[in-house]
UniProtKB/Swiss-Prot annotation, chain B:
SUPFAM superfamilies: Tryptophan synthase beta subunit-like PLP-dependent enzymes
PROSITE patterns referenced in this protein's UniProt entry, alphabetically: TRP_SYNTHASE_BETA
InterPro entries: Trp_synth_b_CS, Trp_synth_beta, Trp_synth_beta/beta-like, TrpB-like_PALP, TrpB-like_PALP_sf
Reported cofactor(s): pyridoxal 5'-phosphate
Pfam families: PALP (PF00291)
Enzyme Commission number(s) from the entry: 4.2.1.20
Subunit structure: Tetramer of two alpha and two beta chains.
Entry protein name: Tryptophan synthase beta chain
One Gene Ontology cellular component annotation held by this UniProt entry: cytoplasm
Family under the similarity heading: Belongs to the TrpB family.
Catalytic activity as recorded in UniProt: (1S,2R)-1-C-(indol-3-yl)glycerol 3-phosphate + L-serine = D-glyceraldehyde 3-phosphate + L-tryptophan + H2O
Amino acid sequence: MTTTRIDRLFTKLKAENRPALVTYFMGGDPDYETSLSIMKALPVAGSDIIELGMPFSDPMADGPAIQAAGLRALKGGQTLDKTLRMAKSFRQDNDHTPIVMMGYYNPIYIYGVDRFLTEARASGIDGLIIVDLPPEMDEELCVPALRAGINFIRLATPTTDDKRLPKVLENTSGFVYYVSMTGITGSALPDTSKVAGAVARIKGHTKLPVCVGFGVKTASQARAIGAAADGVVVGTAIVNAVANVLGPDGKTTADPAEAVATLVRGLADGVREARITAAAE
Amino acid sequence: MNKPVEPNSFRTGPDEQGMFGIFGGRFVAETLMPLILELEEHWNAAKNDPAFKAELQQLGAHYTGRPSPLYFAERLTEHLGGAKVYFKREELNHTGSHKVNNCLGQILLAKRMGKTRIIAETGAGQHGVASATVAARFGLPCVVYMGATDVERQAPNVFRMRLLGAEVKPVTSGHGTLKDAMNEALRDWVTNVEDTYYLIGTAAGPHPYPELVRDFQSVIGQETKEQILAAEGRLPDMLVAAVGGGSNAIGLFHPFLDDKGVAMVGVEAGGKGLEGDEHCASLTAGSPGVLHGNRTYLLQDSDGQIKEGHSISAGLDYPGIGPEHSWLKEAGRVEYVPIMDHEALEAFQLLTRLEGIIPALEPSHALAEVIKRAPKMGKDQIIVMNLSGRGDKDIFAVAKHLKMDV
């Protein structure tokens, strides 16, 4: 496979000796236009990789915050087609920030895998994280995606033991997303020293960068995780920043893009200090 | 979609990947994958272990009350004036439905795996009650997820579960019905991977659940085969069963799938009619998609978002169906038809008066189809219907629809 934006980014960050800040937001939350403004604000505020959430009615691996964000987006009329269009629109002024679409398989299956991959490629999508497609189901989307030149980023979890890791890593590309705990998105962050051990274990099996997510909410957590990982993923905290500026009627009480940008600037400072702090300790 | 070539046998599925044709599979988060593989390994060992079989049989006989009778419904047959109608009386099982067959099998499996905590999802509460029952019997803590809407409309079953020592957790996410309860149970499982066994209530979900639930329920069809041969000296012409997730139907059908002369009809909840969204007829009015770990027929919109179903019967109120039914539909082996709420209600009342049996609203759907078909069949023909549950739980809902006070 030719190098992708994701590969180029990690090469650059390696030279800078700092981890990536990976930010998740829900496409279409609370509506298309607001959500696009959030997306555009992310790299400006210091995000290195954007995870573009595709809303799904039944997000079995997500906690209450992301569930609610997905329902808001669907209520606001978001569809997979619109999420792709959002990426395309973002690409008009940004050609370097990698976009990874994250969600569940059914909307893609219904859209049609081939049609989806063609559109995704045309919209400047770099990678996919599909929660309910384990390696056992690789023929569904992973293999066609790789053929289409789109990275398929796999989740590795604390239950993925050394015996299973090679299978999980086999068709993974771009980076490995290590889920720091067993559980749903937005739960409490576990002991960061455990996370460092897990990252080391995965690195023993792959040369790919390892990003860590699930539970990272603050700049200090981002700094601590970023000392060991190649990237830090923040999702629920960003989704909450949007929810916090929505009134009971769903109308915004402040600019959601600015609320998200403020949070992301803090997180970006956190990851930039990660290795410096680690070296000083 | 191309129709698969008719197989030599309809009873060999699923394949090693857990597929029935294009249906089934293992569409789950990576966190759950090792657990599902572990379950498969233990299941493969258990199903070939005579001691496991013997323990299950023993419990079936002395705890559940198996075999359940095959009853010739003489007055109903006379009333309909056509085929002879037999009922497989699963409603006489301990806990009042076929659900206990699966729960006993799975709790033995959980014990074998060394799991110490049981979780389950429930809609009407029948599976919740059966899970709470077997958890009490084996001394394991049990958490039952139930949509908040269902908690409200199924109060007696909620109380039963609590009496049995289970913790009932109302689910407010989504729309608070069975599919949300299943999402929440999966979220619990993904969090508590070490000690927890997820006791799924129907023949759906990721492989190996559809297979193992079917096998635990197949006792229904196996007994039926022996009983009808004893009573009539031949196999029936038709089997009829209600399908929600489809476990009672697959349990009755599976042992007969290769008996060519036996026609089979699965009856879905047509709700208030298939024109709008107020039904649960995923096979008749849905399309293939991926939800809750398997590919199967679903009620969904053009964006692949899952719809809420509607049925008068909370037990059929699920927008999906077990994957083996999807396969049997496409293979043309089983016919699936919808029955409306009002037809089920009429059938419920008819059976109550004619045979002195109060059926659950789920098999009342199957009964409504029998009422349509039997008169058109010859008097020498035989229908066996799965009377999968008793209707005590439904008297409040029925009273409401009949505008009566309880």
